[in-house]
């Protein structure tokens, strides 16, 4: 933190969740991750549990190997897609990677993602990139994905996120997760739980008291979808 602030960045987010966020006017936004994936995107946790082993390094400088790098880009894209949707820029990023001089083997990247159970949707996202920017013909899967993305805005929608979670966990499961998030999720937002797990009930209570006043519009949208569903 001291290094970043010494470089002129202001700290926007520190010590909880999976990353710290720094901002420097007019446009620089830097996320420093403690983990590549948290509770959201947990299906990729096993794939990227030891990211250092997926890298080449020169002294203290580590870089993902090309196929591992693209696998991570895909995983991050899928995570956002399933959280609530994603924008056109994400698909453009995939095309840029595939047509860069990195010599990426997309097939190997898909293979790396197989343990997550998300390799198929990752493949469809990469295929959509070729449809939009490479002139490839649509398949049924890419057309459905295109329609979903066009309805997602730049960063996805709360409604999409809620519907996706209800589909995975059921209505009651989603409701309980809203009220009582998992211990893993709570640790990301209440670091004290790393030292004192016994405080989980107290943190749940604190969250229930404060949550109605934070992101109020988002919370109301989640409840609206839950009641409608």
State where each predicted segment sits.
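Conserved NTP-donor binding/palm subdomain of two-metal-ion nucleotidyltransferases/polymerases, i.e.
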Residues: 1-229
């Amino acid at each position: 933190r001291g290094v970043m602030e010494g470089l002129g960045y202001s700290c926007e987010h520190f010590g909880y969740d999976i990353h710290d966020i720094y901002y420097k006017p007019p446009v620089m936004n830097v996320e420093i991750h403690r983990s590549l994936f948290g509770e959201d995107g947990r299906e990729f946790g096993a794939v990227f549990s030891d990211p250092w082993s997926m890298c080449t390094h020169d002294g203290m400088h580590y870089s993902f190997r090309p196929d591992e790098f693209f696998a991570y880009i895909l995983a991050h894209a899928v995570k956002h897609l399933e959280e609530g949707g994603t924008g056109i820029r994400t698909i453009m990023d995939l095309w840029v990677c595939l047509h860069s001089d990195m010599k990426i083997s997309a097939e190997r990247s898909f293979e790396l993602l197989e343990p997550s159970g998300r390799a198929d949707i990752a493949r469809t996202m990469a295929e959509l990139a070729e449809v939009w920017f490479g002139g490839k013909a649509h398949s049924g899967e890419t057309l459905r994905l295109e329609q979903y993305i066009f309805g997602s805005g730049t960063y996805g929608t709360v409604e999409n996120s809620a519907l996706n979670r209800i589909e995975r966990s059921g209505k009651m499961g989603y409701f309980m997760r809203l009220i009582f998030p998992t211990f893993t999720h709570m640790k990301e937002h209440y670091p004290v739980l790393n030292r004192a797990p016994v405080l989980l009930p107290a943190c749940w209570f604190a969250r229930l008291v404060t949550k109605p006043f934070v992101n109020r519009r988002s919370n109301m949208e989640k409840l609206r979808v839950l009641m409608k569903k």
